[in-house]
Amino acid sequence: MAKYTIVMVRHGESEWNQKNLFCGWYDANLSPKGVDEAAAAGKALANANFKFDIAHTSVLTRAQKTLERHYGGLTGLNKAETAEKYGEDQVHTPKAVFSRSFDVPPPPMEPDHKYYDVIVNDARYKDGPPKDQFPMFESLKLTIERTLPYWNDTIIPQLKEGKKILIAAHGNSLRGIVKHLDQLTDAAIMELNLPTGIPFVYELDENFKPVVSMKFLGDEETVKKAMEAVAAQGKKK
């Protein structure tokens, strides 16, 4: 029997999503489509009669307006062009070494990278690690290691207090929570493509185990097409 309910949503399409670029910790804004997706997400939540006490998000604009993995040296690169250069199996397939490998990080973001100074000196990260310890990349495994303590130490206690919670975050951060809740294998989570701007619901029992998993607030065909669009981002043109 479900005791707790929590709603999550991946941020709406960003300008860099629209350009098919690896975004990571770069503060890309929402695209016009992303703005529409955020509005549609709000409408879907209202139509489902959801009301929230607390909303959790990341420091980045695209999540605030609707937690992202750090794509290191891939930041700003076109996903399809990267697939062309390194091979599709390195970028976005079940055996992907870069964007969809569970424990192998992408190449590091070196100091001479185009976006290094923009990200490392971003005031949003002022409470983060010092520059000499600033992460230069993240694998999905490292992303989960960064986000799960927040789930366990902050969100779980709030659920126990009876708070109604919405998480508006990033694809990889949310995949980490989904992997944890549904006990997915490394291979299974690599196959999961979370659509932008479509809220999904988890109903949890008293032990925070799913009674209902990833119930999207959208019609099945729309969700399917949105997932396919995400999956296609790493395909060679």
Residue ranges and their predicted role:
Residues 2-68, 80, 84-87, 135-147, ...:
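Active-site-proximal alpha-helix that buttresses catalytic centers in soluble enzyme cores
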Residues 20-21, 180, 215-216:
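Short coil/turn segments at secondary-structure boundaries
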Residues 24-26, 77, 182-186:
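Glycine-rich, phosphate-binding/catalytic loops in enzymes
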Residues 42-43, 88-94, 151-153, 210-212:
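Short amphipathic alpha-helical segments with coiled-coil-like heptad repeat character
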Residues 64, 134, 138-141, 145-210:
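Active-site-adjacent alpha-helix immediately C-terminal to a catalytic or transition-state-stabilizing loop
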Residues 206-237:
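Pan-eukaryotic secretory-pathway lumenal catalytic ectodomains of glycan-active enzymes
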